[in-house]
Amino acid sequence: MLWTVLLTLQATAPPATDIYLADLRVAGRTVSVGTPVNVTARPGYDNQPCFLPSGRAFLYTSVREDGQADIYRYDLDRKTISQVTATRESEYSPTPIPNVAGFSVVRVEPDSTQRLWAFDADGTRPRLILDSIKPVGYYAWGDDHTLVLFVLGSPPTLQIADARSPAKLGEVVARDIGRSLQRVPGRQAVSFVQRDSVAGNWLEEVDIRVRRVTKLVKAPPQADFFVWTPDGIVLAAGGTTLYQWDSQRGGEWEAVADFAPTGLANVTRLAVSPKGDRLAIVAVPATR
């Protein structure tokens, strides 16, 4: 997932961010978070974490001294970082491909075209997934062949595409959407944010089978990114506050954690491990 200025990305220095890791627990449908630990801890852009199916590692995007964006891997057991891709192009938004030993990325090609690509698990054998849909900014896998994509434009559109038909254009199902796309656990649906300057932003979901869009809950202030726990709780961050919304109980958002005492500022992206026991947090150290 790239930020809003995707089209000028190569000419713009990305913001300095780190990735933190914390224990995550759910008791009585309420989330609690352990003390976050900075696992990247360096100057520069480390962002867009996504856990591998094992839950023992996550992939993320890192921009190093040469200004190139490549994919890196953090191993939770060894507490080590390894580089996965080393290409002339820039890769963003690494995401495991369902039922395949590999991952997908948004790749910025030499002519600045942004399309969806796939790599083997070791970062080799790059190949296009969708030929005709561009410029892709963000995306989520709805199942092992259905993709839901944020496609840049004025306004940006939510499009659904089939990886088995790479030459086809996407089907537009919503317009003027936010950047956060997440598969909904237990359902063939993907959540997204519908932006509305009058009524406010809403978290909604699209059923990938029938293309039906359903409102879920109004988004909390300052929150741009949303993630789901395996048991259907949605997490979002605004500033240094972590909020939860329970899709089973409904109701309003609840504040469940404040990261300010732990030295974090401007919390943005979140990622939940497949078992729901770890939370990756993208933030800026308060002292930076």
Functional labels for PLM-detected ranges:
Residues 9-288:
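Sequence signature of WD/YWTD-type beta-propeller architectures
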